[in-house]
Amino acid sequence: MGIFEKFKLGFKKSADNISSGLRDIIVKKEIDDETLNKIEEFLISSDVGIDASAEIKNIISQKKIDPKKNAVEEINAILKEYILELMVPLERKDFFENKENLNVTLISGVNGVGKTTTIGKIGKIFKDNGSEVIFSACDTFRAAAIEQLESWSDKIGAIIIKSNPGSDPASVAYKAIEHAKNNNIRRVLIDTAGRLQNKKNLMDEFKKIANVIKKTDESAPHDVVLVLDATSGQNIINQLEEFDKIVKITGLIMTKLDGTAKGGVLIAVSYTHLTLPTTP
């Protein structure tokens, strides 16, 4: 199943909400300035973002909507085309492909976004594709996080490298990579803490893990994936910017898209950070 088939399923609630909202707004056959402004306001309220909403409004204003046709359907088609043009270049088709050499993926994100569950699901795909996988339990600040990752490793048959709660997370990452090298295992997924005593400590620890990884392999981490919760709205833009300042984010995973009618935030993220690939 490709990225847009998955979006179709996860985006259904948002798509239904947008279609319903457009039907409420568009009561005239001609799209005048007042209607355009209402469409823009509605898109902003759906978490599409100010800049992307303004661009969509401008695109609609330049299109000639046939008054004989259903205006809602016409605008829905414009939105679909816009989203496709925005996101197709960002799809990471190579992310789940088998690798010939060691591949270390650092998974980041704040608590509650579904990081550990996401790691488990990614690990299962790697296993199903024939790759052995190591989980590195670097969220040592929460015993529950280690236990949850261990549960996933048991479930899918992955190897887990862990330590006692409170241990140095970077040392756990180092041991995981060394174990991978010594046993010719090519996939390492590193779980990280989502919340420490303050934001500076969180970012310092995240950077430390990345630096230690690089010492074991100059090309690592090969991917730094940020997990974002779609229900968090525009706040995820700030999360992305904060993490990207510390370690360059190479991919995004959006969770809980099926749990919100305001999934437009994925459009906002894609528009704001066109250089960042998205992983479904």
Each predicted region: which residue ranges?
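Charged, compositionally biased N-terminal leader segments and the immediate start
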Residues: M1-I25
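Primarily NTPase-proximal linker/entry elements flanking Walker-type ATP/GTP-binding cores
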Residues: N17-C138, A145-P165, S171-I190
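G-domain G4 guanine-recognition motif of GTPases
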Residues: C138, T192-A193, V227-T231, L252-T260
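Phosphate-binding/switch loop-helix module in NTP-utilizing enzymes
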Residues: P169, A173-K215
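GTPase G-domain guanine-specificity segment
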Residues: D204, E241-K245, L257-Y271
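Inter-motif core of Ras-like GTPase G domains
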Residues: K207-D229
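Conserved beta-strand/loop subsegment of P-loop NTPase cores
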Residues: P221-V227, V247-L257, L274
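Single conserved hydrophobic/aromatic residue that forms the stacking wall/gate
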Residues: H273-P280
